[in-house]
């Protein structure tokens, strides 16, 4: 078994003494830093490598914290116009994950880089911490590598803002299998392809 396999098994047991201690120390450390900051290396190298990271020039890791909880509707003085059923402000749930938000914010912060993927690293009562893998499309090492130079094409600019990353596709309901059988896309297809002859019509 290689070293990465051991790291993977360690990361799985989040309630172990080692992981609990590490997460508490790291959460404190991350809170002292800026909201978005560059990490010198991934804190989960096994996970980063599985998602496409390589320890070579052109690849960058940024760490970000996102506040946990629901999303309050941004309306001036709480004034929502319309019917009472649509007047909710406080108890609304954002339909995309915190990881999506993290990718978007890092993508705006590093607008000259391309977001490849991201992963969860830590969380506490207030924040969730993510690490985002970015690629420099103008770097020669990236442009000459046939495994990653697809991301250089202009069509991949700000792919995180258009739901084209892994987590972005998940929240769009695009996929196959039991997780996606009740997704909006599947429901729309079913609605359009089901003949419904109601009694009173």
UniProtKB/Swiss-Prot annotation:
Gene3D superfamilies: Ribosomal protein l15e. Residues 161-182 are annotated as: Disordered. It is found in: Cytoplasm; Nucleus; Nucleus, Nucleolus. GO terms for cellular component: cytosolic large ribosomal subunit; nucleolus; nucleus; preribosome. GO terms for molecular function: RNA binding; structural constituent of ribosome. Disulfide bonds: none annotated. InterPro entries: Rbsml_eL15_core_dom_sf, Ribosomal_eL15, Ribosomal_eL15_CS, Ribosomal_uL23/eL15/eS24_sf. Residues 169-179 have a biased composition (Basic residues). GO terms for biological process: cytoplasmic translation. Keywords: Cytoplasm, Nucleus, Ribonucleoprotein, Ribosomal protein. The keyword 4Fe-4S does not apply. Component of the large ribosomal subunit (LSU). Mature yeast ribosomes consist of a small (40S) and a large (60S) subunit. The 40S small subunit contains 1 molecule of ribosomal RNA (18S rRNA) and at least 33 different proteins. The large 60S subunit contains 3 rRNA molecules (25S, 5.8S and 5S rRNA) and at least 46 different proteins. PANTHER family: LARGE RIBOSOMAL SUBUNIT PROTEIN EL15, RIBOSOMAL PROTEIN L15. Component of the ribosome, a large ribonucleoprotein complex responsible for the synthesis of proteins in the cell. The small ribosomal subunit (SSU) binds messenger RNAs (mRNAs) and translates the encoded message by selecting cognate aminoacyl-transfer RNA (tRNA) molecules. The large subunit (LSU) contains the ribosomal catalytic site termed the peptidyl transferase center (PTC), which catalyzes the formation of peptide bonds, thereby polymerizing the amino acids delivered by tRNAs into a polypeptide chain. NCBIfam families: PRK04243.1 (NF003269). There are 2 genes for eL15 in S.pombe. Belongs to the eukaryotic ribosomal protein eL15 family. This is Large ribosomal subunit protein eL15A. It comes from Schizosaccharomyces pombe (strain 972 / ATCC 24843).
């Amino acid at each position: 078994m290689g070293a990465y396999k051991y790291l993977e098994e360690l990361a799985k047991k989040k309630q172990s003494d080692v992981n609990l201690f590490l997460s508490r120390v790291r959460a404190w450390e991350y809170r002292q830093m800026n909201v978005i900051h560059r990490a010198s290396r991934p804190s989960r190298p096994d996970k980063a490598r599985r998602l496409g990271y390589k320890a070579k020039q052109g690849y960058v890791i940024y760490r970000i914290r996102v506040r946990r909880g629901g999303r309050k509707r941004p309306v001036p003085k709480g004034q929502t116009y319309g019917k009472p059923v649509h007047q909710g402000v406080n108890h609304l749930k954002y339909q995309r994950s915190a990881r999506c938000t993290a990718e978007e914010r890092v993508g705006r912060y590093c607008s000259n880089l391309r977001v490849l993927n991201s992963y969860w690293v830590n969380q506490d009562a207030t924040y969730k911490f993510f690490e985002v893998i970015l690629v420099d499309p103008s770097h020669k090492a990236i442009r000459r590598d046939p495994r990653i130079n697809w991301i250089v094409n202009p069509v991949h600019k700000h792919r995180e803002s258009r739901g084209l990353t892994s987590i972005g596709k998940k929240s769009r309901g695009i996929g196959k299998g039991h997780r996606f059988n009740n997704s909006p896309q599947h429901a729309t297809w079913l609605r359009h392809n089901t003949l419904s002859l109601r009694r009173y019509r």
